[in-house]
């Protein structure tokens, strides 16, 4: 069988080094031939050995205009990188593909905050093909994959069920329209800009902006609690302090305390803030609102799922996106 291919550069989706990715398409006359010859996994492996090359094709699921296309893990990674470019990730981070292969087909996607054992098991039971999480499954280098450990069991289950796992971590935190922007918008901040910026590298971690009108700190805290759907939060500062400008950082924001103190914001909203951070803010006449790590980041699940649905539909792929609805904050308040 002879297949003719044409390459079309997708300039909107660069890879890590900024080089445009190529999207390989089969010319019209050969589409039906390629569709009839799609190999299963074993035949694909044999083809690799026999021909010393492997080609992944995204072809329409049926001939004719307007038909949806089958998606692969690689296709979804390209979509995720338009939302949260990989090059934005911090050097210490391990965002990207955690388990699986780019050529694996994807018909169902799960979105979750954490790759916890119960999340991975549920995704497998629901026949998901791709699990997209904020926090990486493999954060530190693994010396071995031991199925007697929690992470080993998750890797084993994912591979056994052919569930790919992809993380969008600090790149989603930093990206424009990403997690920090989502948090700032949710609590009502306007005129949003970067809190910890680097020249030529986008807005960086954290955001800062204005409230529509000044409010008392106690009223701001109650507003945040309501808008974020929280049972509780921690507040530092004079409850009557007038707040007109607010800084935020999702997750653990302690590393941005210096940027907060250097700014003109009266309050800083984040999670995992420490005792001495609280004392420093108290002494400086500033305010802290600690909404917890989970509380500041869980909103990414619904938001990212919706972005994925929009991009999948826009590109003509056929893949369902579901949100994991069972996650809970690991901290319990008595």
Which residues does each PLM region occupy?
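Cysteine-centered motifs
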Residues: 34, 55-57
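Cationic, amphipathic, low-complexity segments that mediate targeting or membrane/lipid association
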Residues: 3, 23, 30-33
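Hydrophobic structural segments
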Residues: 57-334
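Hydrophobic, low-acid, alpha-helix-prone terminal segments
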Residues: 4-12
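Aromatic (phenylalanine/tyrosine) cluster motif
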Residues: 5, 53-54
